[in-house]
Amino acid sequence: MCAVAYRRSLHYDSWCSKEKTPSNHRVNCLLDPKLLLESPEKLGCYCIDHCNLHLKGQIVWTAPDGGD
């Protein structure tokens, strides 16, 4: 198993826009979900979770089959 450490940031910076998963989740928002309370415009983050929450009003995260 490979452990990777990510730096969390409370404000938008160039790192936030670069570190994303293949499914367009931002590492910053996954590690610190309270960032989703801020608008995408304020943080400059338009990840799938920000768009789902602010455009649709909900986020549903699911685990892969057989995972926790």
From Swiss-Prot:
It comes from the Viruses. This is Protein RH1. The lineage of its organism: Viruses, Varidnaviria, Bamfordvirae, Preplasmiviricota, Tectiliviricetes.
